[in-house]
């Protein structure tokens, strides 16, 4: 009887911890990438692309409360083992947005010219990281 009671308690504890981690993991903005955003939504979602233009997607459960933001690319330098600044693009969004895409426009080409590994950031107007993700660009 004691073994089954102990098993039941540990099972409930495991379920509670697992649910809590799942809820916490979904509370932050998530960044991901696609080839383009069109009428039917995201096209070609991946974390690996050939050189060229991409679209950066950010999705959140709550309003981002941002207006002037930037997307920054840092490229991994295999010689030093560190990421180094590569490019930065400025955008203006509405503070109530929960789902936003950043694509090529007249001021921001959003292009990856060189193959490699990149860390991509969404930065607020004080250059604080809102969210980030890694992407691989292949030839």
Task: List each model region and its residues.
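Generic cytosolic/nucleocytoplasmic N-terminal low-complexity/intrinsically disordered segments
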Residues: 1-2, 19, 74
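Contiguous segments within soluble domain cores/interaction surfaces
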Residues: 26-115, 119-125, 129-132
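Interdomain boundary/hinge segments at the C-termini of tandem beta-sandwich modules
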Residues: 137-139
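Bacterial N-terminal signal peptides that target proteins for export
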Residues: 1-10
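Sec/Tat signal peptide C-region and signal peptidase I cleavage site
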Residues: 19-25
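Bacterial N-terminal signal peptides
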Residues: 9-18
